[in-house]
Amino acid sequence: MNASNSRVATVRVVPGKYRPLICLLTACSVALTISARAGGFLEHTRQGPLKGAREIVFAVRGMGPDNHWYANFGQYSPKRLAGKSLFTNGASLRVLNLETGQQRTLLEDAQGGIRDPQVHYGGKKILFSYRPGDTSHYHLHEINSDGTGLRKLTDGAFDDIEPTYLPGDDIVFVSSRCKRWVNCWLTPVATLHRCNADGGNIRSISINIEHDNTPWPLPDGRLLYTRWEYIDRSQVHYHHLWTANPDGTAPMTYYGNLEPGILMIDSKPIPGSDKVISVFSPGHGQKEHAGALAIIDPNAGPDEKGAARRITKAEDYRDPWALSDNCVLAARGRDLVLLDAAGNEERIPVLAEDEIKAGMFCHEPRPLVPRPREPALADRVRPGEKTGTMVLVDSRHGRNMKGVGVGEIRELLVLESLPKPINFTGGMEPLSYGGTFTLERVLGKVPVESDGSAHFELPAMRSVFFVALDQNGRAVKRMQSFTGVMPGESLGCVGCHEYRTSAPPLAQHPIPLAAMRPPDVIRPVPNQPDVFDFPRDIQPIIDRHCVECHNTEQADGRVILTGDRGPLYSHAYFSLTVNGQLADGRNRARSNYPPRALGSGAAPLLDKLEGGHHDVKANEDELSTVRLWLDTGAPYPGTYAALGTGMIGGYESNEQVIENDSSRPETIAAKAAIDHRCSSCHGKNSLPRSLSDEIGLSFWMPDLNDPRIRRSRHIVFNLTRPDRSLMLLAPLAKSAGGHGTCRQPDQPPGSGQVITNRNDPDYQSILSMCTAGSRRLNEVGRFDMPGFKPRPEWIGEMQRFGLLPMELDPDHDPIDVYSVEQAYWKSLHHHPPPVPQH
C-alpha cells in the first residue's frame, strides 16, 4: 500500500490465505490484517459497543438485472418477459475472522439466493432470507453461527426479505404478501410484516400501497424504515425515512418526505447517540441500495436539510453498520470497508478472483457479536376491532395555510389510495396523462367543527388521506401523503402539513370541540360512485353541457370535448388535461401547495360548469360528480384492468411495444403523405407521422406548455370516427367538409386548401392509417368498449389471489373487471378474527 496521502488502506483477506500484517483498529475494537499506516483509525482509543468482536457475517451474491433499488426479488409482470427473474443465482453466507483472515461458509447454494443476514441479540444465531436453488421465492431462515441448525421459518408463494429481530424475539420483515405491484414499474411490492419467532402468526403492519424497506429497531423501541409514496406528486422523489411502533401504530416521518430527492435506506442507529447512519442513494435510488453514506441527527425535525451530513463523496456504498460514532462497517463494490466519520476508509477485499469473475459481490456485513435489546413496546393493536379513530386538532393550523379563514373548512373528504393488482410500465398511462398513477376511492365525508377540529372513525389498515372542503364542497387544502390506523388505534394530528416540531396552537377551547364527543362515522356521498371512471361518469356531463360547442365540426377555442377515442385517451379527457382544466398534482416534485391550488378548489372546469362560462350551468348532482372526480386525481379509467391494453402505441417496460403501428403498411404510406403535404410548414418533429409518434414529448412527464402538445397524436387522430381526425380536417378545404385551417405558404390566411378534396391520394393514405388504427383498437378493445377483456396477467393475478376461478375461459367467460377489483381491494381489508364461541 502506498502510505503517502491516500485516505484508503487495503486489507487483503483472500479465502484460504493469511498474511500476518496486523494492526489494531482501536476505534472499532477489532484487529485487521492491514498494511500499517500512521494516523487514521489508530489514533482512536478502544471504545464502542463491540469491544472484543472478531467476526463479521456477510452475504455473497451477484447483482440483479434491474437498476431500481427495490427490484431484487420476484419476476417481471409482462407475459413477454415471463421467466425473467429479478435475482441472480449463486450465493453464500459467510463469516470472516478479522484476526486470522480465515473465512468459513455457513451456507452455500450455487443456484439459490441468500440475503439480508441479521445477528440475534445473543450473537449465536443468524436470521436471513434464503431462496433455495430449485425455488423462486425468498423466505425467512435461521442458522446457528457455527453453521448448524438451518431452519425455515416462513413459506408460501410470496417473498419475505430484509428481516430484523424485535426485542421480544418476534421478527419484522418486508414481504410481497401484500399482493400488489409497483405503481410505476412491473415488479412486485413488499411492505412491513411481522411474525412470531418461529415464523407463525404472520400479519401486516403497514398500510402502504408502495414499498417499505429495511426496517430496524431504534434505541427507544420504534422501527425505523424507508417508506416510498407518491400521492399526486412525483413518483421518483419521495422515498425517505419513517418510524412506527413494532405493531404498526403511530407511523411518523423521521427524516424527509417534504423536500424531494434522494432515496434514504438501510438506516440504523449509531450506538451511544440519537443519530443514525443511512445510505443516501442518488435520485430515484440505485441498484442494491448503493449510495453515499450519511449521518442524520433527527433532533432538529424531519425537514431540516442541515441535519444530514454525508461522510462519503462516492455513491457506491451499501449496507452500513455503525460500530461506534466514528466507525462504520459497509459493503463497497466487491469489498467490505471500514470508515470513520471523516470518510477515511479501510478496504477489506474478501472475494477470490474466480468469484469476482463470476460477478459476485459482498453484501450486508454485520458484526457477529451479542448486543443489547431495545425496550419492548407494548402492543396497542386490538385485532378484533374493524376501525380506529383520528383526532384533528385544527385544520387551519399549518405551514402553508395563509388566507384560510375561521370556519372556512367545513368538512373533510376521506379518500383511499388503492393498490394495483398488476402493472406493466414506468408511466401512468392510460390512468392519466402525466397525472395520477393510482385510483383513489371516495370513502365519504366527516364534519369539521368551528374551531377547525374533527374526530372520526377510520377503517383499519387502509391507506387514506384527506381533502379539506369549504361550504360548497370545493377543496381548500389537499393532503399529498397518506396515513391510517391499525385496529383499535387512536391517532391524532395537529393540523394540515404543520411543522412536526410544533405544538398545537392556543385555542379558545382547551380541548378541541370534536374531541369532546364520540367520533363521527364517515358518511358516504349519496348518488356517487366510490371509484370514478371518466367515460362512464364524466363524459355524459361533458356531452350535456360542452360538446355542442366543442366538437370536431365547431371546436370553439380549438378545444374538442367529444368522447371519441384517440390512441390512448378520449379526446375530451386529453383536451381537459392539456388545456389546464383539472388542477391535478401532476407528476411534479412538489408538495404542500397553497390553499385552493389543487383539485376542485382550483379546477377551471368546475368554474365553467358552475356558471362561469356562457350559459353553462350543471346541476348539483353533476357538480358533485365532477368535484369528487377532480379530488380523486381525475383518472381516465376507473379500473386497473385498463393497464397495458386498449392502446395504439402504448408502453410496456418503458418501451413502446403495445400495438406500435410505425411499421404497418398503412402507416408507412401515411408518413410519406404527411411528409409530402405537411413538413414544408411544420417540419418533421411538429406533427405526428404515425398513431404512435410522440414527436419528442415525454410519455410520463409531458410539458403542458410545449406548443406541440396541442398537435399530439392523442388529439389529431380519431379512432372512433377516422374521417373526423384533425390530421385530415385541418388541411382539407372547407368546401370539401374540412376545417381549412392549413394553407400553402403562398396562400393568404383563411384560404386554406392544402388538400382540396377527399379523393386526394395523400388524404386517402392518412385516412387509411386512421381506419386501420380504429379497426385494430376495436379488435383489442379498450376498458370502456363492449366485450372488453383484460390482459392475461391481470386475470392470472386475480386467479392467484383467489378472486377468479382457475378454470375460467377468458375467451368466452364474461368478466366484470370493476366488480372483481372491488373484491380484490376488499380482500386486502382488515378482517377481525372470529370471536371464540363458548
Locations of the language-model features?
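Sequence signature of WD/YWTD-type beta-propeller architectures
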Residues: 39-451, 457, 476-478, 482-484, ...
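Aromatic- and Gly/Pro-enriched helix-to-coil junctions and flexible linker segments
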Residues: 38-47, 51-53, 88, 98, ...
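Intrinsically disordered, low-complexity serine/threonine-rich segments
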Residues: 5-9, 32, 38, 577-580
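Bacterial N-terminal signal peptides
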Residues: 22-33
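Hydrophobic alpha-helical segments, especially transmembrane helices
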Residues: 18-20, 38
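N-terminal secretory signal peptides that target proteins for export/translocation
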Residues: 1-18
